């Protein structure tokens, strides 16, 4: 593995790169946070300095997303996978059902976890039939009668697909795993009852999950809920029911301020769409590389591509790593390549990758 004395372009799907200026700010405050004489890592979660960090981060997030007051914002410990259990526990009672769109591995895992405890849950779409290259159009007619909610994964990191527009439902609340795209574009927030996201793509370090839910649509359920999965309990305690991942919350807060300085989600969406278009255009015009995802379903966060000559794959990855392009190997179950170009990936990183791909094709095509 090569060694570098400078920052490289990190295309890993997650944990992913953070904005350099956020890292620099965290570095400057690491040993002595704003005159406290200690690091945020050492700080009690019960004292005023951390409470200020927590409150500011939530306030900034609310501003970025234009959240109505009825929506709660809660930080949960652990990864988004914990919410695969927490959501059914909070929204289903014994005998209840809900609907899932199985658009990839993570939606399938969430479905299987819910079905362990609530055997009546249903799938309304199985993307395995198209090798997860397509997404459904979901309307009220798609949703089963009696479904307590409709669950989607908004962006699929493994396959490079996403919903360009979201379902607008009256029949059932919409719940979305947005781990790999939250804060990358504007959202019609009031169309969702729950949005959750692991932090490690666009928010901050791993080990933290953000849950946003409509308090008016949180039902009373007929069973006890484990404390660290209980939405109402965690919200009542201000994300401090237990010791939270304090440093991850601090970094998330710095990221939110960075996004505000950049102009908010409208600017991020414009930038991300431009980055993705550049890369897809380069792939589509290549005679060596190709993108397997149909245009209407292509993700702006995770650009999946392959080679017509898979005998060159290992050479491409090796040379890419040597030249400072990390994390381009595709997910282990699908192979090929994947460039994750989250908010923190600068446009010049995409431009540099395109130049490298073109040079590789000239030398090996």
From Swiss-Prot:
Sequence positions bearing N6-(pyridoxal phosphate)lysine: 201
Entry annotated with the keyword Transferase: yes
Enzyme Commission numbers on file: 2.6.1.52
Primary enzyme class: transferase
Record localization: Cytoplasm
Cofactor comment text: Binds 1 pyridoxal phosphate per subunit.
Residues that hold pyridoxal 5'-phosphate according to the record: 80-81, 106, 157, 177, 200, 242-243
Pathway assignment: Amino-acid biosynthesis; L-serine biosynthesis; L-serine from 3-phospho-D-glycerate: step 2/3; Cofactor biosynthesis; pyridoxine 5'-phosphate biosynthesis; pyridoxine 5'-phosphate from D-erythrose 4-phosphate: step 3/5
One example GO MF annotation: O-phospho-L-serine:2-oxoglutarate aminotransferase activity
Function of the protein: Catalyzes the reversible conversion of 3-phosphohydroxypyruvate to phosphoserine and of 3-hydroxy-2-oxo-4-phosphonooxybutanoate to phosphohydroxythreonine.
Family note: Belongs to the class-V pyridoxal-phosphate-dependent aminotransferase family. SerC subfamily.
Protein name, as recorded: Phosphoserine aminotransferase
Species this chain originates from: Leptospira biflexa serovar Patoc (strain Patoc 1 / ATCC 23582 / Paris)
